[in-house]
Amino acid sequence: MTVATAYKRHSIRGVRLRGSIHFRGSGKKCITQLFGEQMMVANATGCSSIYGGSAFVHRFAIESSTGAFFSPYCRNYRSGRGPAWANSLFEDNAEFGLGMATATRQMRESLKRKAEELVNVTAFDWMCEATQKWLDTFDDTLANRKATDEFVAALEKAILPIDGAIEFWQGKGKEAYGAEVAAQKLQEAKEAKAAGSPICPCHGCELESYLLANKEHLAKRSQWIFGGDGWGYDIGFGGLDHVLASGEDVNVVVVDTEVYSNTGRQSSKATPAGAVAKFATSGKKIRKKDLGMIAKSHGYVYVAQVAMGASQAQYFNVIKEAEAYHGPSLIICYAPCINHGIKIGMGRTQNEEKLAVECGYWHLWHFNPAEEDAGKNGFHLDSKEPDWSKFRDFIMGEVRYNSLMKTFPQEAEELFVATERNAKLRYEGYKKLSEM
């Protein structure tokens, strides 16, 4: 037993002790530590793809036992498995990820029908047991990985070579099934060998051979769609809403920097009132769009708003709940950005997230439809009552706000009051939902 295996793999301590199969210092690292060996990622063009895996450096390098990393995404050196990552165009990433999920689901459902048929025809109890275990964990990402490995091992063991089939029907098969049946099966085996078949021609072996030939599609995939607020709130919003409305089992992460970061600091619908950005040099006049509440209105979408620096435990639990939920999920992550002009420096972004939540600028919450279906209140406000006295100090600690005071001081004061009022209205709305 090693230190890493002393704790449950998917506990907070267990994850911290495991090697990552993604670059370090990111919320995505935590996701890869939990589900990396089964992850498929559709990544929108933007900051999330630039620092998340540029095409010309992306390669399946092996993670070394010493923790050395050679590319943003790597394979686990023990299992040889790792995330499958692809970068789409900016505007169609949600649909791109949906296509991945749909294709995977249809392939697995086809294999599921074959496995259900195999349960009824296999002559081996251990084959039946392994097949049934795979079927029972079909929709469980974590449990199905182990069940798949056992299923594949059983398939490899169960397939009878053609010479073995001939030998069986000449001897033990005759005793077990009778001379008449054995003679018929022996003739079929000889004909199959003459035709060049390497395996027993029985229906069970045919099913096992087909399943084994498609073994890479057996395990439950963890489908993720990554993008920024320019994609999720603006240009790709129509596609994102379509994907959420599809009911497909996908997980969407929106990295919310509240501005078009990669394209040059332009204002987006995620930009709050009072913030200075291109196309809003005198401060944005209208409030930030509440993407989370829009997604929640579907009623069957798991939605969460997180800030890892404010609560690692909430972020960790949200990631696990989102993956476990059988349906679409949306996780909106507050992400301090160089375009914010943070006075304390980009080396302290985790602390900036903590301050944002403490003062009420950002709120932590999650909505789980599964709890609502069970007759409970599925909405949970995860952050404490904000200290509103810190709100003005927080925004003045960022150049995107304090620069407005220098250029348009009168308008700045009015907009800053509106910014705080909007934050309070959001909080009161979330609080009411959590108390229902």
Question: For the regions a protein language model found, what residue spans apply to each?
Answer:
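Short, glycine-rich nucleotide/cofactor-binding loops
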Residues: 18-19, 228-233
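Glycine-rich ThDP/TPP pyrophosphate-binding loop and its adjacent helix/strand module
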Residues: 192-212, 217-225, 234-251, 255-385
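General structural feature for long, well-ordered alpha-helical segments within catalytic domains
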Residues: 23-27, 34-37, 43, 103, ...
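Conserved thiamine diphosphate
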Residues: 13-18, 80-128, 133-140, 144, ...
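Flexible, low-complexity linker and terminal segments
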Residues: 1, 31, 63-132, 136, ...
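Iron-sulfur-cluster electron-transfer modules
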Residues: 1-185, 198-205
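Structural signal for hydrophobic packing residues in well-ordered secondary-structure cores
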Residues: 32-39, 55, 108-111, 115, ...
